[in-house]
């Protein structure tokens, strides 16, 4: 699993995977955009990437979403998001 350096993202922008998806921690306050794959951590402490499109589509009060490697295809864990 690759986690890009925050300072490098601020200086050069988010890296892209082979599919052209950007990935990394959400540094939108510094770079003005959210990556396609957002760094997240499961309840079990597994770090992975949450697809922005999955997160944006949440409509229920609780939803379990897959976490992926930076390739955006290899599922490694699940994350339960809760909305208010």
Indicate where each model-derived feature is located:
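Extended, alpha-helix-rich binding/interface surfaces that flank or overlap catalytic cores
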Residues: 1-84
